[in-house]
From Swiss-Prot:
It comes from Thermoascus aurantiacus. The active site is at residues 157, 263. One of its GO terms (molecular function) is endo-1,4-beta-xylanase activity. Residues 1-26 form the signal peptide. It comes from the Eukaryota. Its EC number is 3.2.1.8. The gene is XYNA. Residues 29-326 form the GH10 domain. This is Endo-1,4-beta-xylanase.
Amino acid sequence: MVRPTILLTSLLLAPFAAASPILEERQAAQSVDQLIKARGKVYFGVATDQNRLTTGKNAAIIQADFGQVTPENSMKWDATEPSQGNFNFAGADYLVNWAQQNGKLIRGHTLVWHSQLPSWVSSITDKNTLTNVMKNHITTLMTRYKGKIRAWDVVNEAFNEDGSLRQTVFLNVIGEDYIPIAFQTARAADPNAKLYINDYNLDSASYPKTQAIVNRVKQWRAAGVPIDGIGSQTHLSAGQGAGVLQALPLLASAGTPEVAITELDVAGASPTDYVNVVNACLNVQSCVGITVWGVADPDSWRASTTPLLFDGNFNPKPAYNAIVQDLQQ
């Protein structure tokens, strides 16, 4: 009596067992990176680091579905130069080596930022000292990875919500010139890397911060500051995706050779919001690509909002499938 039960169970399960590899092949064939490249863009990327690449299905999904990686934390100042002149490249080296071995583009993130900044930097009060420290940090990182990194977020989150420049140790001690100095230093260190100014809440064309960064980038570029791109982080609340359709063309109007969506996640991961952001990039000729800020929801910096394209079991969510369908049109 047992044998027929086993046979029946086997027959019932057989279609599902057979479907698994087919499903995996289908997902691999529907790489959002391959699809967006077919639409004329350079990459569809993701933020990651060694701790992610060595756990779960992160590495396999990135290999199959994404074409660019941004280090989530390993290239930030607190990780790379925790004390003055003492550099630690272990995490950054791992990411760069993995990306090169797997044929992925790399976005360097980030060189000058007020957050995750060691206290030895934030406590500097002398202008010349801080200028030299900043220049040395930029030059050291960019020289180490010269020719390996497609683009760098040179200056990150320099603006307040009202469009004024954020009060940071760099602004307060060096003055507004810290931004031109940072970009000029970066250009000298790796002339072929694309140099970005990167910020969040650039998701509405009518928002003061969005308008301010456009105006200031125009001014800086007119003065010869080598800014190649504006990065819009695009950390969205539910329903904000539609605003990017108007905001991204405004950012592109600053005249930089490139713009990019650099840290995308959406609270609730609405397919509509994600598709709106993808279409915004498709509609703007200078938009080179999109980077989502992590693979799976539990690893997100805002995990409780389930904002990413894969769930906790590394299964693609409706937003991922919606992007695939959108890019296939």
